[in-house]
A protein has these predicted regions:
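Sec/Tat signal peptide C-region and signal peptidase I cleavage site
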Residues: 15-19
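Sec-dependent N-terminal signal peptides
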Residues: 3-13
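Non-catalytic cap/lid and distal C-terminal segments of serine-dependent acyl enzymes
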Residues: 20-284
Length: 284
């Protein structure tokens, strides 16, 4: 057998390592810190990818959930997926591919903020590649945009702006900076005013609040007669059991609701996954 040159051998080993799941804590295939070079921008796009158990291109196409992180940029994919897999095991939701874009802290998921281009990177560069390489659907009726905190604001924004790409948006503890009338708002979403009728008919919205609030945005949705599902996490600490992610690690006698693990655990987490499944039009 011919010996491979050292560089070629190293490349082969590296490629194989990158293609393999890097966690045994999940039922599906969990690939963290993958990179893809954008064909439009040339940017290196970092992301975490989750493929459901027994994923294969012959079962294509797979519904998709894009999960946007908060302002700090922390990767909460493992905790979110543990909640999803528990719901999947109990039959509340079916198979989904997940993508967790990384390293967009402070951008509110807008091109140009902090010198980043998350809209172009994810929607125009990464998603087409995932469709090709991992049999991800291009059908908007099988796509959900979901996020936590700043990512929740991003999901509200992307859901309305990119109606051709997503049919469901899930916002987990967004703050109060969302407005469809104020261009100076941190999360300015004029599409809710300019595309009202289309949004009324074709966008499924779920808002889940923990420590923060979206009262003004909820009032706007009501004024515009845009339907949405709303859930507030329990306010009494007695509703959270020992070991809950909704309790402070430093002082378990205090609540800590503003974190993705808390926002996706418990009965409210199950209702979120059920909401996504209910609004995903699967091909039979």
């Amino acid at each position: 057998m011919k010996a491979l040159p050292i560089i070629a051998l190293f490349s082969l080993i590296l490629s194989d390592t990158q293609a393999q799941p890097n966690s045994t804590n999940h039922q599906g295939k969990y690939h963290k810190n993958l990179t893809y070079k954008g064909h439009i921008t040339g940017d290196e796009i970092t992301y975490t990818l989750y493929l459901p158990p027994e994923h294969t291109k012959t079962k294509a196409p797979y519904p998709l959930i894009v999960f946007l992180h908060g302002a700090g940029g922390g990767n909460s994919s493992s905790q979110v997926l543990m909640s999803y897999e528990a719901a999947r095991k109990s039959g509340k939701i079916g198979d989904f591919v997940f993508v967790f874009p990384e390293k967009y802290g402070g951008t509110v998921w807008r091109d140009g903020a902090k010198g980043k281009r998350p809209e172009t990177n994810i929607l125009k560069e990464l998603l087409p590649n995932l469709e090709k390489e991992y049999a991800v659907t291009d059908n908007r009726n099988q796509r959900t945009i979901m996020g936590f905190s700043m990512g929740a604001a991003g999901s509200i924004y992307w859901g309305a702006k990119y109606l051709s790409l997503f049919s469901t948006t899930v916002s987990l503890d967004a703050g109060g900076g969302t407005s469809f009338t104020d261009p100076k708002a941190r999360n300015y979403v004029p599409e809710y005013g300019t595309k009202t009728k289309t949004i009324q008919k074709s966008l499924n919205i779920r808002l889940v609040q923990g420590a923060l609030n979206t009262r003004n945005f909820q009032q706007s949705l009501g004024m515009l007669k845009i339907d949405y599902e709303y859930e507030q996490l329990p306010r009494e600490i007695s509703n959270y059991t020992t070991g809950s992610s909704c309790l402070s690690r430093k002082d378990p006698t205090k609540k800590f609701l503003h974190n993705p693990a808390c926002m996706t655990e418990g009965s409210w987490g199950e209702r979120t996954w059920s909401f996504i499944e209910k609004n995903t039009k699967r091909v039979k």
